[in-house]
Amino acid sequence: ALTDARKGINMFKKVNVDIIGIVENMSYFICDNCNQKHYIFSKDGVKKEAEEFKIPFLGEIPIDTNLRIQSDNGIPALIDNPDGEISKKFISIAKNLKKSLD
């Protein structure tokens, strides 16, 4: 996925399309048994790429079963569980996006 992101970034740069930020999707999951974060695809890879390309890193979205269920049912996480951890992640990303645009 990181290779595809690099290709996309390079393509957008070639055609002079501004990139307003990068979000890392499926960045980690929290184990139901031990409550620990597990980075199964690597850690901070997208953040490092964002720094290298001088693009704002907006945040990360973990792998989350409830988010998948909400998405499958067409119910946004912010509507279904506005105080949940996933909703907080989306709000943080939105705030970081606003900061990068100011």
Predicted regions, residues:
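Conserved Switch II/interswitch segment of TRAFAC-class P-loop GTPases
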Residues: A1-K7
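C-terminal lobe/tail of nucleotide-utilizing enzymes
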Residues: M11-D102
